[in-house]
């Protein structure tokens, strides 16, 4: 995506698919939890301006840029509905998260919640990975080992099978990729 060169196209596309379903005129009012996909840019801008004018938090456009981040991004509500500008803003937020979290999962969590260690952010990360066709499979057998077998060394002597290596197979999509390690100066309002 030429609009968002700091982020791998597959990663950015997965974020967009999760955030807006690829619809450029989506307005999500975080206060009322109501999301609307408008038929035109003008209608989306008018709705978002009204919501922001009431002091409510709203996510806008393809990458669902939050209204609280507009000042730091130097954007107006109207500008954020330009698809390329919206993608560039989303990429800046994601790259800034990557610079802080130093992992794609942490960056995605920060993109969604402002924190790299959030349970909600972790669930969001899995959804974005799923949009890109990446799924981490379950460990074969599907049961957790008892903690004493993992911690107490003497149990290995009495149960050599407990020491057998577990091979975890991760099957990523051939189209999935991470972020380019580009640092960005932008810090969303929720990270301060």
Regions found by a protein language model. Give the residues of each.
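Catalytic glycan-binding domains that act on GlcNAc-containing polysaccharides
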Residues: 1-138
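N-terminal secretory targeting signals
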Residues: 1-5, 133-192
């Amino acid at each position: 995506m030429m609009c968002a060169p700091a982020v791998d196209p597959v990663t950015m596309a997965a974020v967009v698919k999760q955030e807006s379903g690829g619809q450029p005129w989506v307005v999500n009012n975080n206060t009322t939890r109501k999301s609307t996909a408008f038929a035109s840019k003008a209608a989306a801008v008018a709705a978002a301006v009204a919501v922001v004018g009431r002091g409510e938090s709203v996510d806008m456009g393809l990458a669902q840029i939050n209204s609280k981040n507009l000042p730091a991004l130097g954007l107006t509500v109207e500008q954020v509905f330009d698809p390329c500008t919206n993608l560039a803003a989303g990429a800046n937020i994601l790259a800034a998260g990557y610079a802080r979290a130093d992992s794609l999962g942490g960056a995605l969590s920060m993109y969604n919640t402002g924190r790299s260690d959030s349970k909600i952010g972790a669930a969001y990360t899995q959804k974005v990975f799923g949009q890109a066709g990446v799924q981490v499979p379950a460990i074969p057998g599907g049961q957790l080992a008892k903690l004493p077998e993992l911690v107490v060394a003497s149990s290995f002597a009495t149960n050599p099978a407990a020491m057998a290596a577990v091979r975890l197979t991760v099957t990523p999509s051939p189209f999935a990729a991470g972020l380019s390690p580009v640092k960005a100066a932008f810090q969303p309002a929720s990270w301060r």
